[in-house]
Amino acid sequence: MSKVGTGDSKNTLYCSFCGKSQHEVRKLIAGPTVFICDECVELCMDIIREENKSSLVKSRDGIPTPKEICKVLDDYVIGQGHAKKVLSVAVHNHYKRLNHQTKHNDVELAKSNILLIGPTGSGKTLLAQTLARILDVPFTMADATTLTEAGYVGEDVENIILKLLQSADYNVERAQRGIVYIDEIDKISRKSDNPSITRDVSGEGVQQALLKIMEGTVASVPPQGGRKHPQQEFLQVDTTNILFICGGAFSGLEKIISARGRTTSIGFAAQVLAPEDRRTGEIFRHVEPEDLLKYGLIPEFVGRLPVVATLEDLDEASLKKILTDPKNALVKQYQRLFEMENIELTFADEALGAVARKAIERKTGARGLRSILESILLETMFDLPGLEGVEEVVISREVVEGTARPLYIYADRADRASETSASA
């Protein structure tokens, strides 16, 4: 900071960057031994914005191929090959479309939002989370059951955009290229086929409210969240390029699809859809827009979800793989917990099969695996920190079935294995 002249001028402050005096600029901000004017701050902001834009363009050019996307999904999600293919192609095309828009204006490519239909615990949420991780874009999840129309008690649909903005650290440009996953979308279906005379604020009303942001609109988002009021300043977020993925278990939809199959008089559909012994996931593969309309989704909402990916029930082999194969597999997680006590945790192959069968019986899919393992290992995790000399814990099929206790193998004497026979 320099001071020029004499008299009054010796008390004049100057910008350390451009040299302008405090009288030539609107604001002069003081730092330790330096000053910066508002014009230099604006110039610095412009430079940063340009750098951010150029880095964004680089990421746009590096869109992973559908095969690359599918390969990474395989690391985290077991099975569901058909759903992975549909998602990989849809997401690749979505970001290719954004890249196309920055270079060409002759043909406008429409956005293709995605609907995931599958039984509970089949991997819908995990697929969406993994996609966001692959693409390194802002990602947020919303629960459709908490949403209501604007003005009613509950969460506004625009709060979804606020959450996305928060995950992008309030970088509007990054948020506008993000992914929104709306779970439990089947819970906002219309309560009956006929329009009701009473207001359905958490069903059809929410579908109507979601239409605009899914298609593309400029949403006014209150930065601090909560309800809007006139004195508030809003952030403007364009939702045109945000990819919406909706997921739901759609319990009962298989009956609608099967009923349609039985009414088919000719062709292959009657034989394909009618059998009662077909698994839910297999029946979902034959879903048509008319089935979703009968279920209670309004036509405009179904039209906003042109890509439909169906997930199948997980069989015993798939559930066993989920326990051991992914990078964040449950068995690996518990083994790491036991390693912290310097103890090795071992599961017999038959034990993993028994855990998988329990999950199938409970109809909870992969989501139920953790609770089953927690109940099996509860007593062991309670006792172990107070025991000395335990080197290994072995879980057998009998332990899972509740007819025996885990086998404790001690380091000092192999014959001191604590093996409790089947309880009566």
UniProtKB/Swiss-Prot annotation:
Keywords: ATP-binding, Chaperone, Metal-binding, Nucleotide-binding, Zinc. Pfam families: AAA_2 (PF07724), ClpB_D2-small (PF10431), zf-C4_ClpX (PF06689). ATP-dependent specificity component of the Clp protease. It directs the protease to specific substrates. Can perform chaperone functions in the absence of ClpP. It comes from Nitrobacter winogradskyi (strain ATCC 25391 / DSM 10237 / CIP 104748 / NCIMB 11846 / Nb-255). This is ATP-dependent Clp protease ATP-binding subunit ClpX. GO terms for biological process: cell division; proteolysis involved in protein catabolic process. One of its GO terms (cellular component) is HslUV protease complex. NCBIfam families: clpX (TIGR00382), PRK05342.1 (NF003745). The lineage of its organism: Bacteria, Pseudomonadati, Pseudomonadota, Alphaproteobacteria, Hyphomicrobiales. Zn(2+) binds at C15, C18, C37, C40. The keyword Chaperone applies. SUPFAM superfamilies: Glucocorticoid receptor-like (DNA-binding domain) (SSF57716), P-loop containing nucleoside triphosphate hydrolases (SSF52540).
